[in-house]
Each structure stands twice: as structure tokens, then as C-alpha cells.
């Protein structure tokens, strides 16, 4: 009989951070942890088909298994291309 595990689910916005602790059955997936957290109901801007997820800052799939003590993170989409931002900063500093 599988035991219970405790997992945190995190979602951060510039103005607010959400951190929900959930208890799941061993063998639960990242997606099950997110759904159990209630964040999908709280934040309608989270779309699991678009938002990337991870466990402790490492990319993960929704089907990956979570372990006791894991922190599942839901990432926001990038607003700007990091390469483009670096290029713009380099041009700006070159023009000084």
C-alpha cells in the first residue's frame, strides 16, 4: 500500500507568490500535484498546455513523478526574448 508524500506547488508573479502544500499518494505526478494545489482554480492565467513546469528549478514534464519534499514550480511565459534583450543592452552601452 503506497504511503503519503508532502509536496509544495509554487507559482510566482511580480506582485504575489503562491505556495501551496499538498499531500498526495506516493507515485503522484507533477500534474496531480498542481491540480491538488487548487492553483488552477485560483489563477485562470495558468494553462498547463502552455506554462512550463519544473521541480526545484529543473525542467519537468507533467507526467514526472514527484517525491516527498519536492517543490513543483509553474513558470510564467517569457515576455521578451532574452537574446534580444542582451542585444539591445549591448547596443545601448556601445552608443554611450
Swiss-Prot record:
It holds the Pfam family Ub-RnfH. Belongs to the UPF0125 (RnfH) family. NCBIfam families: PRK01777.1. This is Protein RnfH. The gene is rnfH.
Amino acid at each position: 500500500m503506497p504511503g503519503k508524500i508532502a509536496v509544495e506547488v509554487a507559482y510566482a508573479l511580480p506582485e504575489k507568490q503562491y505556495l501551496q502544500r499538498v499531500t498526495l499518494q506516493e507515485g503522484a505526478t507533477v500534474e496531480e500535484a498542481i491540480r491538488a494545489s487548487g492553483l488552477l482554480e485560483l489563477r485562470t492565467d495558468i494553462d498547463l498546455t502552455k506554462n512550463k513546469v519544473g521541480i526545484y528549478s529543473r525542467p519537468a514534464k507533467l507526467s514526472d513523478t514527484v517525491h516527498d519534499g519536492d517543490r513543483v514550480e509553474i513558470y510564467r511565459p517569457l515576455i521578451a526574448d532574452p537574446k534580444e534583450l542582451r542585444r539591445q543592452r549591448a547596443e545601448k552601452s556601445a552608443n554611450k
